[in-house]
Amino acid sequence: MKFLVVGAGEMGRWFGGAIAAHAAETDAGDETDVAFADTDTEVARAAADAVGGRAVSLSTDERFDAVCIAVPMSAAESAIERHAPTAQRALVDVTGRMADPVAAMREAAPHRERVSLHPLFAASNAPGNVAVVIDESGPVTDRISEALAAAGNRLVETTPGEHDSAMETVQAGTHAAVLAFAAAAEDVPDGLTTPIFEDLSAVAEQVTGNSPSVYAEIQATFDGADRVAEAAACIADADDEEFERLYREASDAIRDASATTEKENR
């Protein structure tokens, strides 16, 4: 089976690597071909070398069983439209947003298998939860799901609307809160820290150790940061009574969210 990954960045390599690794562990190893195409040919070659695949031109007229779109969110729809004809059986994206890419894949490849995937982690933290929207299933997308599950990932089926709404809190709001904490923090003498401060500092270090362009795309795509800013302003301006009310609201919200997560994980 032939796979083309359009975009040889972090998530493209993650996807191609999972497909190649699963093929190597099964009888399909000799029959699986993973190719990468990227605007930077050196990046495509490096990704191909890392998984035992090959690099091809973005303008290739070769056909593949499955094409995975792994480009920035802002380029997803145009990439789907351009490369859909290359996919003979299945079209997949790992761009991070779901509503618009799913609609674009449905329009560009109405008679092919279609799945939208969103790994909810950086590739260096894999495996983890992978959000999945199955728009049209079949043997190729089933094999992709098997490969991701075999790599230790937990596949979480969702809908485009549910996913994109959740990302307002999970990504845009969370990143805004962490970056605001980091930006506002001042130097603290050794020994004058608390466990909460140290934990938040560790999270901030993790967030700020990645590509700022990725986080900028998330902020441009999803709402959520504005609600964090509004909540912070309310807390800063609150008197004692109002602060206690806000504190209780926050406590109840976190407790409810934790209970929901625990129930879903059972």
Locations of regions flagged by a protein language model:
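Short acidic-hydrophobic, aromatic-tinged amphipathic segments that line or gate anion-handling sites
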Residues: 54-59, 156-160
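Rossmann-like NAD(P)-binding element
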Residues: 58-85
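Structural motif
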Residues: 2, 65-66, 90
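Rossmann-fold dinucleotide-binding core
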Residues: 97-154
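Short, conserved loop/helix-junction motifs that constitute active-site signature segments
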Residues: 83-88, 108-109
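Redox-cofactor binding/interface segments in oxidoreductases and associated redox assembly factors
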Residues: 67-69, 92-93, 132
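An accessory alpha-helical subdomain
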Residues: 154-266
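NAD(P)+-binding Rossmann beta1-loop-alpha1 motif at the extreme N-terminus of oxidoreductases
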Residues: 1-53, 62
